[in-house]
Structures are given as C-alpha cells and as structure tokens.
C-alpha cells in the first residue's frame, strides 16, 4: 500500500514524526516536509528536521515540496491514502480552495479528485468560523478531519503517551495496526 504523509507548518511537528516512525515499516511511504514544518521544528526543538529524518528513516521516500513534477503529483502513481499531520490552517485553506502551489497541496488535490482517503490532522486552537467552514466543506467531500485531541480513557500521564494516543488514532484511520495506546473497553 502506498501512503503519503505530509508534515505541514503547524506546531507539534513531533506528532508527525511519531506517525512517520510507526508508518515506515508498514507501507510504501512517501513523506513531504513543508518549509513551515522545518522552521517550526527548528524553533520548537532546536534541531534540523531534514537531518533527523535522513538519519532515522531509511525506508521512507522524502520528497521536495517545491518539485511539482514528482510522481505523487499524478493520480496514476497510485497513492492510496494521504494524511497531513499536523496540518496547518494555511494547508487546510489551500486544500479547500484547490490551490495546488506545492507538491503537498497538489498531492492533496489528487487525493480529492481520485476519491482516495485524505486525512487532515488540523492543528489549531481555537478554530475560527472560517476554519470550521473549510473543515465542513472538506468533510462533505469525504475528507476525514482528525485534529490531535487526546481522550481521558487513554490514561496518558505524560507528553509521550499523549503523542502515542494521537498518532495511534491517525494510524487507526489509515487502517494500520499498532500498540500505541490501549483501546477503549467498557469497564
């Protein structure tokens, strides 16, 4: 299965890395890091996102967001599932408007036109009315809106457990098995 992971310029890029770590050996994985993601990661972690990815993820195909001629820009390439996590509000608005000015935005447009699974881990708080309208319209088109929200039943006691829960929920939506959090049980 071919999966595309986009990590866009929202805060909490670490959530995208957690997802990347758990996807890498489960599928044929393509990843696009936006310029905003790289800048935010450097600010939040005092580290270079591209270097960390190149050192730690050997089986992932990292793609240049500026190169719209790459394979994932075409529906014939066969990406089955696309997830943008975290997804910035700017990316959300561009996807809703059909503004495909980067490889990631073009890949999202392809997912929409090909009626493939598209998941957006929208990372913002609070949402404006305009943000909610974008999410509503995209949801009506079949896009899954999956903000990074923890649940009390996850019993998360620290940041890593919270990140595991969120990444696990995204993996559930991608239909990828994992053991990142304990599933709900009727006690």
UniProtKB/Swiss-Prot annotation:
What would be one Pfam family of this protein? Answer: Flavoprotein
Sorted UniProt keywords: Flavoprotein, FMN, Prenyltransferase, Transferase
Q: Which reaction does it catalyse?
A: dimethylallyl phosphate + FMNH2 = prenylated FMNH2 + phosphate
Q: Which residues bind FMN?
A: 9-11, 34, 88-91, 123
Task: Report whether Flavoprotein shows up as a keyword of the record.
Answer: yes
The record's section on InterPro entries has: Flavin_trans-like (IPR036551), Flavoprotein (IPR003382), UbiX-like (IPR004507)
Disulphide connectivity of cysteines: none
| Gene3D superfamilies in the cross-refs | Flavin prenyltransferase-like (3.40.50.1950)
The Swiss-Prot or TrEMBL record describes its family as follows:
Belongs to the UbiX/PAD1 family.
- What is this protein identified as? Flavin prenyltransferase UbiX
Species for this entry = Campylobacter jejuni subsp. jejuni serotype O:2 (strain ATCC 700819 / NCTC 11168)
